[in-house]
Structures are given as structure tokens and as C-alpha cells.
């Protein structure tokens, strides 16, 4: 079995190590979230994936976004396909790097966070932890399969790319489906400031 994704990694010398998967945002690349890999648990294998769609040099997307006038839309079918592909290829990384299949965490930012929610809700409890930064739940990517994933959500109250209200709507969806989560807001735009970074790292170290 091989993977179709380009990725960079930081591997653990420990057998049966936890696996942390990093999913970057729209227009970014695999180097973005990997920049704080040194802050993540030392015994974990860390895989940072590059999204498959090239927008321009060093800029990639998991699925296309387009506008109809002022209305933002996205390629629903493309998003569902990449979600399923990521779920299917989890086993490749587990086997190649001798990881613990019961200790998989996803850290996603923006479009990567949206995908992370979709993966968690469609993967039959494959994911132990999800850190969803500056994203939201997209209903068309949900299957609402039963799972026990721990979820951390954060959003900047001044986010100009994905409005803060998207996370409020996400919380309502999760509440309506009796899904537990931790939600924190920060005085920031579309990004992760030091307070946000410390917050999700503290949470992840307790959970992973």
C-alpha cells in the first residue's frame, strides 16, 4: 500500500507510537503547521500532508472554493472525495511508521479543520483527538457515525476569512447531535496566536 499524498514527517523511535496528522489551510502547504512540530509530544510520529490541488507555487487546497457573485461556494463532491481518501489512507501511515491505531490525532487549520470534522464524523472512531483551528462543521461532509473522539475547537473573534459565527453554528450542530467538545475563542484574526497555541497544546498533551 502506498499513499498518493506528498508529506513531511517527524518520526518516533518508539514502536506503537501515537500518530499526529497535520492538515493545513486553503492556500498554504505542509510546512505551515509543521512549523510547531517541535512543540508536539516527543514520542509521537507527526505527518504533515500537502493538499493535492495546486493553486500557485507553494500554495495548495484540499478542494476548490469559488464565488457566485458575493456568495462563497465549494466543490462538495471534491471535498467528500478527499475526506474519504484521507480516511482510507490512514492505515498506510499506521503501518509504515508502526503507529498505534487507537491513538490518532488530527490538527487542522481552516480548510484542514473543516476536513478534520468530516473525517472524525465519518471514520468509525478511528480518530482519538481533533484540534480544529479557525474552521467549522460543513454539514455535507458529515456522516454522524458514532465515535468517541475528543474535540477541541478554537476561533478568533476577529476572523475575517471564516467568520467567528461559523464556530457558533458548529457548536449548535455538535450540541444537537450530543457530541462533546471544548470551545475557546481568542482575540485574533484568522490565525493562531500564542495564547491559542498554548491552549490547544495543553489540551492535546492531556488527551493524546
Stretch-by-stretch model annotation:
Residues 108-112, 116:
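Gly/Ala-rich beta-loop-alpha elbow adjacent to hydrolase catalytic centers
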Residues 152, 168-208:
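C-terminal catalytic histidine-bearing segment of alpha/beta-hydrolase fold enzymes
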Amino acid at each position: 500500500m502506498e499513499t498518493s499524498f506528498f508529506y513531511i514527517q517527524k518520526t518516533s523511535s518508539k514502536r506503537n507510537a501515537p500518530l499526529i496528522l497535520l492538515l493545513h489551510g486553503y492556500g498554504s502547504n505542509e510546512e505551515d503547521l509543521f512549523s510547531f512540530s517541535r512543540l508536539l509530544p516527543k514520542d509521537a510520529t507527526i505527518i504533515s500532508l500537502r493538499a493535492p490541488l495546486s493553486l500557485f507555487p507553494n500554495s495548495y487546497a484540499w478542494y476548490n472554493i469559488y464565488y457566485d457573485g458575493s456568495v462563497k461556494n465549494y466543490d462538495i463532491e471534491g471535498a467528500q472525495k478527499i475526506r474519504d481518501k484521507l480516511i482510507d489512507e490512514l492505515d498506510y501511515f499506521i503501518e509504515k511508521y508502526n503507529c498505534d491505531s487507537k491513538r490518532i490525532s488530527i490538527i487542522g487549520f481552516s480548510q484542514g479543520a473543516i476536513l478534520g470534522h468530516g473525517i472524525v464524523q465519518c471514520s468509525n472512531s478511528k480518530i482519538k483527538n481533533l484540534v480544529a483551528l479557525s474552521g467549522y462543521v460543513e454539514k455535507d461532509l458529515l456522516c454522524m457515525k458514532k465515535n468517541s473522539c475528543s474535540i477541541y475547537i478554537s476561533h478568533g473573534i476577529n476572523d475575517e476569512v471564516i467568520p467567528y459565527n461559523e464556530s457558533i453554528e458548529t457548536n449548535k450542530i455538535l450540541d444537537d447531535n450530543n457530541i462533546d467538545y471544548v470551545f475557546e475563542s481568542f482575540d485574533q484574526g484568522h490565525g493562531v496566536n500564542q495564547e491559542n497555541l498554548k491552549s490547544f497544546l495543553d489540551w492535546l498533551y492531556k488527551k493524546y
